[in-house]
């Protein structure tokens, strides 16, 4: 099952028109980041959180580590993480039952094979069909510990046909073409 979470903002927050300002706003929004953190903490099984901007990924990783149980393993992976370390993390997560990996789309959307992955969270907006399907593919690998995986695709609605909601609409089109079952849940951040 794929869950799409659409975050809505207050009228004052909905005046952003520039793409870069919009991305800066959502990646620095405390309630949005706390929602992602709390979702990670509440989910059972191994969870992959995918981000676009390194600064955002680092922040999410620290936020998650602060609240995660002391025995819950959390990892941060980005382009600067050497391949040996990536492989060690992959091996550890394959054996874990409740790890959290915060990773960049560029590194983890392709080429990393973790079959023991139960949840994927898209923490950053984008519209690429290939990246979308490759990222979902991380969770489709079979493993004896799961019947399937869940995707949490977080979108941001500024009520003005903003850039990130346009990207979300494109992703919904992909999900419809691929005949994925999904549910849209609105979350007010007011």
Question: What is the predicted function of each stretch?
Answer:
Residues 102-103, 110-125, 133-134, 148-154:
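A short beta-strand element within the Helicase C-terminal
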